[in-house]
């Protein structure tokens, strides 16, 4: 995953600014559960270990099997489920997350949807079947938000990748913003030199 650019930039910082940045980063959450009128969303950097998530929920009385999903899980239980996820998975997972449904949505499309990034949508084809260049907007040729799953959940995707390759720079990259209340997408291109 590199990190060399970040490392170089951190090395170039004044020590006090570096310390302040590290202190601030330590206060940031690894995950969040937010609710809209329609459903809860699990916000994580990279994804979740779905088998561990379903096992935790089952231990706490929510059986996701047979198309039931995690409909019975309230916000507090979803927070607890995320709290026991490995921080490595929350920050780095790809295989085992993008390539299979989460099992958290019911057959009717009810339950929590996972929103994550870390994997640029232009690279999703390495980790799952997304069909062609789903991660590239045909008109602009830049990264775009991709919704995955839905085949067994009444057309409702169970995973949303919002990493539109901003870190790759101006050729493909842009910032993607997803408004959860209505699913509206907004984009800001990365310009040369940014």
Locations of regions flagged by a protein language model:
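Cytochrome P450 core scaffold surrounding the K-helix E-X-X-R motif
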Residues: 53-58, 124-130
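Active site of divalent-metal-dependent phosphoester/diester hydrolases
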Residues: 87-116
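Active-site neighborhood of phospho(di)ester-bond hydrolases with catalytic His/Asp-centered motifs
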Residues: 44, 114-118, 160-165
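Conserved catalytic motifs of the protein kinase core domain
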Residues: 39, 110-112, 157
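Active-site neighborhood of divalent metal-dependent phosphoester bond hydrolases
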Residues: 1-52, 56-84
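A short acidic-Thr-Gly-centered motif at the start of a beta-strand
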Residues: 32-37, 103-107, 144-154
